Amino acid sequence: MRPLIGITGNQLLEAVPAFSGISVAYTPIGFVKGVQAAGGNPLIIPIGAPETAADYIAKIDGLLLTGGQDVSPNFYGEEPSLHIGATFPLRDDFEMALIEEALKQKKPILAVCRGLQILNVQM
């Protein structure tokens, strides 16, 4: 059986005409294809309430933390600087809960770019 790999999703923070102003959840296709090429089945995990993290982690064999917005400096005791990009605190909260659960449930974590940053903040 192929391992089920949870891939953290993202959300467009601004309305995009192509989607008629509808909020869109997504993940870059490269992560999906990479998991498939490595022999896994990808499962995109949409941003949700932190209390749902345990359920998601229980269903997957590994977690892939993807890139995206900057991690909010509030989570590591700093003030925003002039050079910070967009932040998404709801995503930060949810992904930190996913990381906490993955560690509790001894599930492997692979982190890329922002994913490595949020992993570092959580640890």
Language-model region placement:
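N-terminal beta1-alpha1 cap of cysteine-dependent amidohydrolase-like domains
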Residues: 1-112, 120-122
